[in-house]
Amino acid sequence: MQSIPIKNVGESRLVDPFQRQYYYLRLSITDQCNFRCTYCLPDGYQPEANKPSFLTLKEITHLAQAFAEMGTEKIRLTGGEPTLRKDFISIAESIANIEGIRQLAVTTNGYRMAKDVADWKKVGITSINVSVDSLDPKMFHQITGINKFDDVMRGIDRAFEAGYNKVKVNSVLMKNLNDKEFEQFLVWVKDRPIQMRFIELMQTGEMDSFFDRYHLSGQVLADKLLKNGWILQHKSHTDGPAKVFTHSDYAGEIGLIMPYEKNFCASCNRLRVSAKGKLHLCLFGEEGIELRDLLQSHEQQAILQARIFAALQGKREHHYLHIGDTGVRNHLASIGG
């Protein structure tokens, strides 16, 4: 069994062969989603027959404890749509109470926010990312397949009322669809503490033609921001991949996630676990390493941690999107994007 390095204060024991430290876990808790976004699940969620069920609350708790002991400080609950789980609040509360977990985030389509966001705050969810691909209700409906724009906007307002001092909003950038709304998004965040994040469309196995038609480099937006006085900010060790820009005249921020940019992977600090218990070292990578068999009792913790550490030693230096290699992923819903 490969030995795991001793954890010093402020360090992670999750270190790969390129000396990148991992503080951040993206944990999918369901593949199911009630939206039909054109870039992700245009035909809606299709359950697979005779496939394993999603991780239980007990298994999720054991997993989160193992990662926390190895230096993980931030866990993000993803899906699918994580809030569709009936035990979502219990999952969040359990993770929030684990020693060492300083940040518990959720990525959501916002469908339940207006109703439930105050409870999310109470149980320890520290930050929220909500998907809003357009500020035009008709375009929102066209992209998501769901006529819920007003509900999502109301949910963002409720998040501020519940005590969140910032909300992150994700928008997948698509040429000739929502890229025309960039100025409108800037106006929207002028007086609102929203970090508006534009995510470059990423190529996956099922979406080659869609990618060719709608991909637009985030550098186009970066150039506009820099030209107009926006300033690129430094990252903390638990931040995600977004390049964040601020402007003295704006309450909000702009984030750009550009996976095709040179050296995008150099600062990688996050691992992923699927809703059925497989560890994924990269969004565009391998089939996954099975962890579920070691999530049944606390006595398995040391073996579980050794398996995670050993798997990490096989992490690649970077993805190969630039040469069209998208790995084995047909779409991103199964491991939370």
From Swiss-Prot:
Species in which this protein is naturally found: Haemophilus influenzae (strain PittEE)
The entry's keywords: 4Fe-4S, GTP-binding, Iron, Iron-sulfur, Lyase, Metal-binding, Molybdenum cofactor biosynthesis, Nucleotide-binding, S-adenosyl-L-methionine
Q: Which gene underlies this protein?
A: moaA
Which residues of the sequence carry a binding annotation for [4Fe-4S] cluster 2?
C265, C268, C282
Q: Which residues bind GTP?
A: R26, R76, T107, K168, R270, L271, R272
Q: Which NCBIfam families does the entry link to?
A: moaA
Q: What family does the entry list?
A: Belongs to the radical SAM superfamily. MoaA family.
**Name listed for the protein in its UniProt record:** GTP 3',8-cyclase
What does the UniProt cofactor note say? Binds 2 [4Fe-4S] clusters. Binds 1 [4Fe-4S] cluster coordinated with 3 cysteines and an exchangeable S-adenosyl-L-methionine and 1 [4Fe-4S] cluster coordinated with 3 cysteines and the GTP-derived substrate.
Matching PANTHER family = GTP 3',8-CYCLASE, MOLYBDOPTERIN COFACTOR SYNTHESIS PROTEIN A
Q: What is catalyzed by this enzyme?
A: GTP + AH2 + S-adenosyl-L-methionine = (8S)-3',8-cyclo-7,8-dihydroguanosine 5'-triphosphate + 5'-deoxyadenosine + L-methionine + A + H(+)
